[in-house]
Amino acid sequence: MSNDSIKLIDEIGKKARKAARQLAWLDSGSKNATLHAMADALIACKKILQVENEKDLEAGEKNGLTDAMLDRLRLTDQVIASMAEGIRQVAALPDPIGEINHMRRLANQLQVGKMRVPLGVIGIIYESRPNVTADAAALCVKSGNAVILRGGSEAFHSNRAIAAALAQGMEKGRVPSDAVQVVSTTDRAAVSALLKADQYVDIIIPRGGKGLIQRVMDEATIPVIKHLDGICHTYIDADADPAKAIDITFNGKMQRTGVCNATETLLIHEKVAKTILPALAKRLNQADCVLRGCPETIRLVGEVAPVIPATEEDWDTEYLAAILAIRVVKNLEEAMDHIDAHSSRHTEVIVTENHATAMRFVREVDASAVMVNASSRFNDGFQFGLGAEMGISTDKLHVRGPVGLEGLTCEKWIVLGDGQLRS
């Protein structure tokens, strides 16, 4: 790790810690006004953003980035307008800071409760999408946190330009400009330095591919909020409505394949597999979805659609593509055993009209979200009514599921007395 990287992160960390203290108890009106000013600044700086973005696009083409990656990188007029609107939507969300819950009076007349407060300084490490810079900044400002952003080198110029525009907006409000800082180097050693800056940073949130998240897990000396994989299952029960089962599975797999809440494995009860699988396989095949199935799946689907024999590796694979692994199971217990053995604890779905079966699945299956008769694709902050999110956590500490504003806060105990002494 280079001394320059350590020095850079040390300087940024000190500024962020000071800004976090100033921001922590800024009133909601001031934060919201600042967020609107930040959104306005993005629109006002559109031409500058696109000039800087073009540098990243040209470098990306030279470095062989795929068309899909270049598309995610590109800051069109629509993308910039969407970023600004996203900031305004965050401003419209309820402010969780200062909420007091569970306040009660004890026998000795002490009043004891919990107050919601910011985490402090959040480090966010992410890849490709420069819009994350604006999204993360907005969520952190609203939740009273300072943020240190380290985007991918492929979006280096874009991220710096977005941060500079946001700083112009913050200058018009009461939010200290150091509350949002970008690590202004492509040196990978700076990532290592940030992951070990526990004297300044309270939480690390990685957003990106498995390689990035694994590196963060291996190197960080700071608590991490993350999900490593999205191996999500849909289980079609013996008491499932066939039409619902087909629609829910198809939507979970095909509505958008390259995301963490897409269904990767279908489990189906043997009693309904004969009637549901052929129709489902035909529909998936027509949508160019590759099927990988157990021997019973291959037998039941027959000539309706091609099915590749599944291997043990398939049950542990997050495809992020139009590929679905299928296994026929004898009962609910076998389905839950399979999920327990292979799930990434992200999103699990049951399709059934049997309430008792559904409630048992909800109680016993371990995941950040369990769906009954609904697509796995609904595990999302916007879909849950939380507004913007920082990602979806499969951890059990400190937050689980979509990480919205409340997930970027914690609680502290408050005690109100009138001279009470402990005997």
Swiss-Prot record:
Catalytic reaction list: L-glutamate 5-semialdehyde + phosphate + NADP(+) = L-glutamyl 5-phosphate + NADPH + H(+)
Pfam families: Aldedh
Enzyme Commission (EC) number: 1.2.1.41
Main localization, broad class: cytoplasm
Keyword Nucleus: no
GO terms of biological process kind: L-proline biosynthetic process
Cited SUPFAM superfamilies: ALDH-like
Keywords for this protein: Amino-acid biosynthesis, Cytoplasm, NADP, Oxidoreductase, Proline biosynthesis
Enzyme class: oxidoreductase
Protein localization: Cytoplasm
GO cellular component, one term: cytoplasm
GO molecular function: glutamate-5-semialdehyde dehydrogenase activity; NADP binding
Pathway in which the depicted protein is active: Amino-acid biosynthesis; L-proline biosynthesis; L-glutamate 5-semialdehyde from L-glutamate: step 2/2
Assigned protein family: Belongs to the gamma-glutamyl phosphate reductase family.
Function: Catalyzes the NADPH-dependent reduction of L-glutamate 5-phosphate into L-glutamate 5-semialdehyde and phosphate. The product spontaneously undergoes cyclization to form 1-pyrroline-5-carboxylate.
NCBIfam families attached to this UniProt entry: PRK00197.1, proA
Protein name as annotated: Gamma-glutamyl phosphate reductase
Organism field: Magnetococcus marinus (strain ATCC BAA-1437 / JCM 17883 / MC-1)
Gene behind the chain: proA
